[in-house]
Amino acid sequence: MSSGNSYLKNLKKLRNKKDWTQERLARESGISFHTLIKIESGRIKNPRLETLIKLAKALGVSIDKLVS
């Protein structure tokens, strides 16, 4: 799946909309806090589809909404 970096802005926006910290999103999605930091900072340029699905599920949105 090629999502480019469109997920970066959406991820932060959706997390902030829920008023969640990075720690909370990491806990709710089941991914490590350090991985989430790397994703949000762009150090992980192409997160695995499985990771994006976990994040979308935790945020209560479709994968399409996360990466669009």
PLM features: residue spans?
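A short, Lys/Arg-rich alpha-helix, primarily the initiator
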Residues: 1-17
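Alpha-helical residues within the helix-turn-helix
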Residues: 16, 27, 57
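Short alpha-helical elements of helix-turn-helix
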Residues: 5, 9, 33, 49-52
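Short, Lys/Arg-enriched C-terminal cap helix and immediately downstream tail that follows
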Residues: 14, 48-49
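Key DNA-contacting residues within the recognition helix of helix-turn-helix
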Residues: 12, 37-38, 67
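DNA major-groove recognition helix of helix-turn-helix/homeodomain DNA-binding modules
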Residues: 50-65
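Short alpha-helical DNA-recognition segment
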Residues: 20-38
